[in-house]
Amino acid sequence: MEKGIATTIFELLSSGVRLDAYRLLVKKGTDGMVAGEIASALDIPPTNLSFHLKALTQAGMLTVTQEGRFQRYRANIPLMLDLIAYLTEECCAGHPEQCADLRSVSRCSDAVLPPLASTCAQPEKWPITLTEISNDNHPSL
């Protein structure tokens, strides 16, 4: 991931409404939600939400599919995982024992973090790279 893409993602998520909508859609996984359900869950007017969903979709953070007269939104989870990989790719400068101590107090699931091993600072050696997972799943920002 390029620094500019990460910066754009953080700028978009600096809006409370966008952050809430994105987290809700991450929670829903591949099922996603239609816009009206999102508006109801977040207790905001659909017209207000529409603006935020459009911004997230245009940036590639959400995908949208038409279902009759409804639009179903889904979080681009591979992009989220790519961001986590970008943030952690040089964690603890290759000293996994430091990462282990820090992870023990973190609420982040080990399932989304790179394995603690001698490859800690070398994501290209992870069993399955996030680039392979997200290949063609999110547009360039």
Region locations from a protein language model:
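Amphipathic alpha-helical dimerization/coiled-coil segments
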Residues: 1-5, 26-27, 77-141
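Alpha-helical residues within the helix-turn-helix
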Residues: 40, 57-58
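Divalent metal-coordination and catalytic microenvironments
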Residues: 49, 56, 73
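N-terminal helix-turn-helix DNA-binding core of bacterial DNA-binding proteins
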Residues: 4-45, 67-79
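Short, hydrophobic secondary-structure boundary micro-motifs
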Residues: 34-35, 65, 96, 100
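Short coil turns linking two alpha-helices in DNA-binding domains
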Residues: 45-46, 52
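Short, Lys/Arg-enriched C-terminal cap helix and immediately downstream tail that follows
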Residues: 60-63, 68-69, 84-86
